[in-house]
């Protein structure tokens, strides 16, 4: 999973009694649950869910490092500024769990507001790869305002926060650059697997070059020349893939 909107789809199958059994379904909680009810009540609710409906998975948007308190949550999506250590991601992945990150209206960089540098959408893909996340969630995809073609503002939210595509199957520069970032992240993932599987000195050297290339993109404080660094990194990535 490289991109997911804030939608969880549960697939169901009919059981022998005519009821509905969830298959790969997840109950999703956003950040407001803990803020509203508190961590202890949140844990009690999750424990009850695990006891009464163990076939359901749990997905959670997390801005308080709650994944440490709820290690059984199948899919955790943390706020971009709350980076999950690589060893925690690896431990969760070993259990078959997914760890992603998200951006929303309070995150300055990287983001995809109407006024954002379009290259930030590409950077989001590189940040995903550099941190080792399984994917990225962007709020939001198509929560359109009253006149989305002419005014992207919504209340006090940054302009363009609530949607990245337009009605009538219209794309946007922001969305197309995000696709570019996703493609880069997928290419990085594929190359890592290929270099590891090859097991040759040349492949090991290329793997090291790729890791060094990524090391400069695991930050969310933009440097003055970040656009140039991104362009150069994309060029080197293409060289490594040849």
Question: Predicted regions span which residues?
Answer:
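Residue-level recognition of short, well-ordered coil/turn positions
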Residues: 7, 97, 196-200
């Amino acid at each position: 999973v490289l991109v997911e909107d804030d939608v969880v789809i549960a697939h169901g199958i009919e059981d022998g009694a005519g009821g509905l059994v969830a298959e790969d379904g997840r109950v999703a909680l956003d950040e407001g649950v803990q803020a509203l009810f508190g961590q202890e009540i949140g844990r009690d609710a999750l424990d009850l869910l695990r006891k009464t409906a163990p076939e359901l998975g749990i997905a959670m948007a997390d801005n308080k490092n709650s994944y440490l308190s709820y290690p059984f949550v199948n899919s955790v999506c943390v706020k971009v500024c709350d980076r999950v250590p690589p060893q925690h991601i690896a431990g969760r992945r070993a259990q078959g769990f997914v760890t992603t990150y998200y951006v929303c209206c309070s995150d300055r960089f990287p983001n995809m507001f109407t006024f954002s540098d379009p290259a930030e959408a590409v950077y989001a893909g590189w940040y995903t790869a550099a941190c080792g996340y399984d994917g990225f969630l962007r709020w939001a995809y198509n929560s359109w305002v009253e006149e989305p073609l002419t005014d992207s503002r919504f209340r006090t939210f940054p302009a363009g926060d609530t949607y990245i595509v337009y009605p009538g199957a219209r794309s946007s520069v922001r969305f197309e650059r995000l696709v570019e970032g996703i493609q880069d992240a997928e290419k990085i993932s594929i190359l890592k697997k290929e270099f590891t599987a090859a097991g040759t000195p040349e492949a090991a050297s290329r793997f090291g070059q790729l890791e060094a290339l990524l090391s400069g993109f695991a930050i969310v404080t933009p440097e003055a020349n970040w656009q140039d660094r991104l362009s150069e990194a994309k060029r080197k990535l293409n060289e490594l893939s040849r």
